[in-house]
UniProtKB/Swiss-Prot annotation:
InterPro entries: Arc_rbn_hlx_hlx (IPR013321), CopG (IPR002145), Ribbon_hlx_hlx (IPR010985)
Cited Pfam families: RHH_1
SUPFAM superfamilies the UniProt entry points to: Ribbon-helix-helix (SSF47598)
Name of the protein in question: Uncharacterized protein ORF59b
Any Gene Ontology biological process: regulation of DNA-templated transcription
Length: 59
């Protein structure tokens, strides 16, 4: 799947924690952010609080 660039602002303390996580798991910052977002969304889908992508695409 093609990836698109997304920009956002984050506090310095959060970036420090993110970089530590990335180094621990040998990820770059982008990979760590993608992993965090994927986990957040998967948790929401499994709890039924967010519609699955397939359902959204059918609208």
């Amino acid at each position: 799947m093609k990836m698109r660039v997304v920009s956002f602002k984050a506090e310095e303390d959060l970036l420090v924690l993110l970089d530590r996580y990335a180094m621990k798991y040998k990820l770059n910052r982008s990979e760590a952010i993608r992993k965090a977002i994927e986990n957040l969304v998967k948790d929401e889908v499994s709890e039924g609080t967010v519609a699955r992508v397939e359902k959204i695409l059918l609208w």
